[in-house]
Amino acid sequence: MRGIRRIVIAGAGTMGSSMAQTFAKNGYDVTLYDVFPTALEKAKILIELNQKTEIAEGIVTDAQAKEMLERIEYTTDVEEFRKADFVVEAIVEKLEIKHSFWEKVSNLVEDDVVLATNTSGLSITKIAEKVNHPERFGGMHWINPPHIIRLIEVIKGEKTSEEAAQVIYNLALEVEKKPVIVNDALGFALNRIQLAILRECLHIVENGIATPEAVDDIMKYGLGLRYACLGPFEVCDLGGLDVFNNIASYLFEDLSDAKKPFGMLADRIEKEQFGVKNGAGFYDYSDGKDAEKIEYRDRMFTKLAKCLYE
């Protein structure tokens, strides 16, 4: 596999733009591609705002931010993929759209260029069906917001070579991330864990055990603090496997096993209350509270990352 100097990212949304600044911050030349010029303009604004936050938090200097911004190019020209040493795609989460994209792009790049998708749960093996030389294709699942969260899931499809997976893994290390290698499965590992937690949280609220506010506080002031430092298997070892086995023996059968989204989540989807993105979800985000929540999230995530990992 070739050395990596220029990285081309497809999709200039929240994930793609944040990935672009992460690569550029770590010295890579980046081309951010999107079919919509307006998406590229929004990406520029978002990246600049993220840099202002990092300057304010003392993560980068003005000079470093300026240098990073100069490493990013923006384009709607698909021919730019011919210049890529590595490609990562972060376009809409629909299999047919990803198929159309990769069928074209995988035939534009050189045969030794490793290709990755940022899908959060679609099958790597199925996406690879339209990839020229699928052995060089794998998953590179970044976690929102990508410029702050350290974890990256490296997902191996049925045809992903060990060499390609290692290239993706090593690249994640180069940009100061914590990669983990997982095999292809619906939702991979992170989203299976995340959605299992969400299902039980919904079940708790629906059954009157606790309010949404109480559940959020339990995570923020209890489990969240614990899991920021220790994984669930480490927690079990420290607490005693006999203790956890005893609790599991009577509690597992009472936990939710719902097979479809239900109750308060389904109700909000029906009302088109999608969360911060349109002003209402489980909480209200009108009158500027949407921007406040995003700013709070990024500021607190940044502080936590500095405390935990530096």
Explain the meaning of each model-derived region:
Residues 10, 33, 75, 90, ...:
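Structural motif
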Residues 2, 26, 174-184, 206-207, ...:
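NAD(P)-dependent Rossmann-like dehydrogenase/reductase catalytic/cofactor-binding core
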Residues 1-50, 57:
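NAD(P)+-binding Rossmann beta1-loop-alpha1 motif at the extreme N-terminus of oxidoreductases
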Residues 38-49, 97, 163-174, 214-217, ...:
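A non-catalytic, amphipathic alpha-helix used as a structural packing/dimerization or gating element
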Residues 117-184, 188-192:
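Rossmann-fold dinucleotide-binding core
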Residues 38, 42, 56-114, 121-122:
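Rossmann-like NAD(P)-binding element
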